[in-house]
Amino acid sequence: MYRIKDEWGEFLVRLARRAVEEYVRHKRVIEPPEDTPTELWEKMGVFVTLNRHNVPPQMALRGCIGFPLPIYPLVEATIKAAIYAAVDDPRFPPVQPEELDELTVEVSVLTPPELVEGPPEGRPKKIKVGRDGLLIEKGIYSGLLLPQVPVEWGWDEEEFLAQTCWKAGLPPDCWLDPDTKVYRFTAEIFEEEYPRGPVRRKPLV
């Protein structure tokens, strides 16, 4: 059962696109539209991903920022995440206006992270590639990978755990440490088929 209707997903992708374009072109932060569905004012976690169109998935990423926890209303979080993905992802220079025609927008609406319980060696059996995203925390370090990432890269569950450790700045086997907390979550993902094109729900498998 989907939490986010297809029309809401399209609304969020269009909103994220407009937020990016207005900020990149005019340094203007848009306001939530008056016709925002009531349900999208609920607090939810969300990530916005910008991808280069017609580029292999492993090379397509142009920016990805979001909020793992439901701390903002979804409509506001989507605007913030979209702008941050365009100009504040430390892995990339800010998006330039001439790039906008070549980028697709993807919005992932997250469920709250759930702690993976039990002994560390059993963690791979308690997550599933194609369903779960991961958040790993140890001390001051944390890292998150969305559910679509291991699918695009062809990882199994152990590699997914190792790569999330690496994303957190930790050794790849840190998921075997009892002091490392591993959380799983799911996401409903909506994407443009091509820049400014139709929006579809993205299947993971």
Curated annotation (Swiss-Prot):
Xref: PROSITE patterns: AMMECR1
Stored InterPro entries: AMMECR1, AMMECR1_dom_sf, AMMECR1_domain, AMMECR1_N, AmmeMemoSam_A, Uncharacterised_MJ0810
Domain AMMECR1 residue range list: 7-201
Pfam entry (one): AMMECR1
Top-level taxonomic group: Archaea
PANTHER family from the UniProt entry: AMME SYNDROME CANDIDATE GENE 1 PROTEIN, AMMECR1 HOMOLOG
Name of this protein: Protein TK0174
Protein source organism: Thermococcus kodakarensis (strain ATCC BAA-918 / JCM 12380 / KOD1)
